Curated annotation (Swiss-Prot):
Annotated protein name in UniProt: dCTP deaminase
Keywords, alphabetical: Hydrolase, Nucleotide metabolism, Nucleotide-binding
UniProt cross-references to Gene3D superfamilies, sorted A to Z: 2.70.40.10
NCBIfam families: dCTP_deam
Entry-linked PANTHER family: DCTP DEAMINASE
Molecular function (Gene Ontology), one example: nucleotide binding
Organism: Psychrobacter sp. (strain PRwf-1)
Coiled coil: none
Enzyme class: hydrolase
EC number: 3.5.4.13
Encoding gene per record: dcd
Enzymatic reactions: dCTP + H2O + H(+) = dUTP + NH4(+)
Complex and partners: Homotrimer.
The keyword Manganese is annotated on this UniProt entry: no
């Protein structure tokens, strides 16, 4: 497998709809000239934006967190340009971008250092071959203070790895009917 460059990312987004909406360059300032956490195409990746919908974890019901039987009441829904994550807690969000991953590509998501250096960690499982949807993002606030994340700005970087022609996967995410196929919005755990 080889990592793919900005030229390949641009071609796949513009000609095959791999990333929608797609930004061909790096955006570092908003229309008013204010600094942003950058997003868009980089040399060997694509920096995704966080949408305006968030689910912030709360322990109001003193429930046990169980991935097989997850209680939706464990979250407070927030819609806005920013989200405050309580200390030692987490929030879910989604990308602005909708992805359509080709059959011969595996995509890995890494958090942006701007957030990591503030103790905010982004976790996303790999985007498997032929998966499509909005990416659900998990933000962990590892600090003892409230932490802020911004909608419409860069939060993580996607890296695209393409397999050799003779090593394309036998069964894709779509082939096996993956439970998160085509997800839109912030998606909670499914079993």
């Amino acid at each position: 497998m080889s990592i793919k460059s900005d030229r390949w990312i641009r071609k796949m987004a513009e000609e095959h709809g791999m990333i929608e909406p797609y930004e061909p360059g790096q955006v570092r300032f908003n229309e008013a000239g204010d600094k942003l956490v950058s997003y868009g195409t980089s040399s060997y990746g694509y920096d995704v934006r966080c949408a305006r919908e968030f689910k912030v974890f709360t322990n109001v019901h003193s429930a046990i967190v169980d991935p097989k039987n997850f209680d939706e009441n464990s979250f407070i829904d927030i819609v806005g340009d920013e989200c405050i994550i309580p200390p030692n807690s987490f929030a879910l969000a989604r990308t602005v971008e909708y992805f359509r991953i080709p059959r011969d590509v595996l995509t890995i998501c890494l958090g942006k250092s701007t957030y990591a250096r503030c103790g905010i960690i982004v976790n996303v499982t790999p985007l498997e071959p032929e998966w499509e949807g909005h990416v659900t993002l998990e933000f962990s606030n590892t600090t003892t203070l409230p932490a802020r994340i911004y909608a419409g700005e860069g939060v993580a970087q996607m890296l695209f790895f393409q397999s050799d022609a003779d090593d394309i996967c036998e069964t894709s995410y779509k082939d096996r009917g993956g439970k998160y196929q085509g997800q839109r919005g912030v998606t909670l755990p499914r079993t």
